[in-house]
Amino acid sequence: MTDPADVRLRDYTDLTDVALRRVREPREGLFMAESLAVIERALEVGYRPRSVLTGERWLPDVAAVLATYDSDAPVLVAEPAVLARTTGFRMHRGPMAAMARRELPSVAEVLAGARLVLVLGGLVDHTNVGAAFRSAAALGVDAVLVTQ
């Protein structure tokens, strides 16, 4: 990929605008998996990537993970400068995947069998949600509920 305006990169544009992202992601049925570990975890639990955006240096690992989960998602490879112009930030954590959202489970389904639950309410800025989920995983949380 050499042109940030390429239509295949649309899912990855303007990711630094919180208000736009909060509206666009749910409306378009996507979410971003930001790192190879997160992409792999999403694949592991059944999410399917619409595409993967990566730099050349991460391509072998991306290919291996996609092959493991029999994914035929398009892999978009670009130089660091094109990645930064497309996403609005320097991609230093590895590849990103635009993942297709599934229908949300009911609260009862999420809580079934859960002993320790994290509730995130009234979130205004999504930027710290990843840290909350990583902390929840480290603390053995069984379920996470996020209010609108």
Regions found by a protein language model. Give the residues of each.
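A short acidic, glycine/proline-enriched capping/turn motif at secondary-structure boundaries
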Residues: 58-60, 81-85, 92, 102-105
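Short coil/turn connectors at secondary-structure junctions
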Residues: 27, 48, 71-73, 93, ...
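Short, glycine- and charge-enriched coil/turn segments that flank and shape catalytic ligand pockets
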Residues: 58-73, 107-115
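Glycine-rich phosphate-binding loops that contact phosphosugars or nucleotide phosphates
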Residues: 97
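A glycine-rich helix N-cap at a beta->alpha junction
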Residues: 67-88
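Boundary-proximal intrinsically disordered activation/regulatory segments immediately upstream
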Residues: 1-67
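RNA substrate-binding interface of SAM-dependent RNA methyltransferases
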Residues: 37, 44, 76, 102-104, ...
